């Protein structure tokens, strides 16, 4: 339903808005963001080196369908989850600024436009109608208890991939409420980190507190974004920050996180949009039988971290 609605909304957006909105390929030079995906399991703000990637665990749960769940003893568990923190950073020249909007609460999702910072006077559009660029993205109100705010959907994807390149498991959760949650480890080398005053500083102050219309399912507009030199992360204990590995055989795999996979958001560079960690999975007492409990939790070891690379094993 959401996919169908998103397609219809994008068609309507193109027909009704694009004629009056400024074009992104004309006028002054724009300073664009560069989204860098951190390796999965690495806390926000770390360099992605393997010893620092400790923000993950193996969690047996009773209900395989629950968004979250208390980790329990394998003897009563029906599923095993690999939980991991995910983080995305902006290391570009300009902020990532996205405005979502819908006409009424009868629409389940909001269409999204990307606002671009000008390089001449530093101005940043202040709302949806002024934003220069239509996107294929949309926002959706996530009702799960740990969220209850508007998510930018399809922003990031998780996948467990075999050494032969076959995707074994993919994510359910791929939406984010974006804001400035941490400083990137190499912020000192970036030329356009917000200062103390000006449009970038004003935007950063807003994004540091941005909760994406928390507890506001009837909102008609929402802001999502990340300033230069900042990043957004979701901790591994949050709803949907996991892959179900109950049926994954013993072996070596890549855990791959990818941001802006469809390139609907304009960036200076797409080469660093995926990062991976190589890991081994083994079942000391064999895999669970379908519908049964877990004989023993699998042993999972991180072998390598590969920042900016989609393959690692």
Task: Mark where each language-model region is.
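Extracellular/luminal regions of secreted and cell-surface proteins that mediate adhesion/ECM remodeling
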Residues: 24-313
């Amino acid at each position: 339903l959401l996919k169908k609605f998103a397609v219809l909304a994008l068609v309507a957006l193109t027909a009704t808005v694009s004629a009056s909105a400024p074009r992104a390929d004309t006028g002054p030079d724009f300073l664009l963001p560069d989204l860098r995906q951190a390796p999965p399991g690495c806390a926000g703000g770390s360099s992605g080196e393997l010893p620092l990637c400790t923000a993950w665990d193996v969690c047996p749960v009773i209900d395989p369908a629950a968004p979250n769940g208390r980790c329990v003893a394998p003897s009563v568990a029906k599923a095993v989850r690999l939980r991991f923190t995910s983080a995305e950073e902006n290391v570009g020249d300009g902020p990532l600024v996205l405005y979502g909007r819908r006409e009424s609460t009868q629409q389940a999702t909001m269409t999204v436009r990307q606002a671009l910072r000008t390089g001449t006077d530093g101005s940043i559009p202040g709302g949806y109608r002024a934003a220069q660029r239509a996107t294929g993205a949309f926002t959706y109100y996530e009702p799960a208890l740990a969220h209850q705010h508007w998510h930018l959907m399809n922003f990031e994807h998780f996948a467990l991939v075999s050494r032969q390149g076959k995707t074994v498991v993919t994510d359910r959760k791929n939406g984010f409420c974006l804001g400035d949650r941490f400083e990137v480890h190499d912020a000192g080398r970036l030329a356009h980190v917000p200062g103390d005053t000006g449009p970038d500083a004003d935007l950063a102050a807003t994004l540091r507190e941005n909760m994406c219309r928390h507890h506001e399912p009837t909102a008609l507009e929402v802001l999502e974004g990340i300033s230069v030199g900042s990043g957004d992360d979701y901790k591994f204990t949050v709803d949907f920050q996991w892959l179900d590995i109950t049926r994954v055989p013993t072996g070596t795999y890549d855990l791959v996180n990818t941001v802006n996979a469809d390139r609907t958001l304009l960036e200076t560079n797409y080469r660093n949009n995926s990062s991976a960690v190589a890991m081994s999975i083994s079942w000391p007492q064999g895999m669970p039988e379908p519908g049964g409990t877990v004989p023993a939790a699998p042993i999972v070891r991180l072998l390598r971290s590969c920042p900016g690379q989609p393959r690692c094993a």
